[in-house]
Amino acid sequence: MRIYALVFLAASPAFAGDGTCDELWFTRNAIFHGAGYCFSSPLGQALFGNEGCTTKSPELTAAQSARLDRVKAAEEGCVIDPSRTSLDIPDLAIRRRLTVLPIRSESESGCIGWKGGPLSLRTGTSHSAETLFTLEPDDVVLFSHESEQAGGEVWDYVQVYDNGVFRKAGWAVIDWGPEVCEGLAG
């Protein structure tokens, strides 16, 4: 089990070179996109396009500004080449559907072999948010993003992998530990 845990973490995005910086770049620019920003870089245009854009100087809400500050703090030291046209984010298609974008944390943990019951993975931090997937028994769950407080609960953005291959992701209120995981990592 310990060897499997090490393989699981080594195959996760935190060890994938610039994957963490790619995630943070996407989240930061998705905030601007949501505020009507018009992108000029090839990367911004490839990921967000400019349809419906309104400005190069968007006015952010207080919530957007606060989230942007958190992303920028996490992004310190990251360098992204804006002439690229893609990012190393395995769950990019899912992130495009999220109502709350996750912010990558500096650490990660894993639940190897989920023993809890089925659990909805949602687009946002509310039980009324759309269910994207269901966490199932035996899933290998990666926790590598900051938790969010919403509705008096703690929500985690979790990613599910199978032999190092990304399978599904979403937001959930999830209590995890030895009682609901075959093994723990991180």
Tell where the protein language model's regions lie, with residue ranges.
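Sec-dependent signal peptide recognition
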Residues: 1-9
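N-terminal signal peptide c-region/cleavage motif recognized by signal peptidases
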Residues: 11-13
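Boundary of Sec targeting at the N-terminus
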Residues: 15-18
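Amphipathic alpha-helical packing elements
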Residues: 23-54
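Compact alpha-helical subdomains of small soluble proteins
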Residues: 47-100
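C-terminal partner/receptor-binding element of secreted or periplasmic proteins
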Residues: 82-95, 171-186
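Beta-loop motif signature
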Residues: 98-151
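SH3/SH3-like beta-barrel superfamily modules
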Residues: 131-180
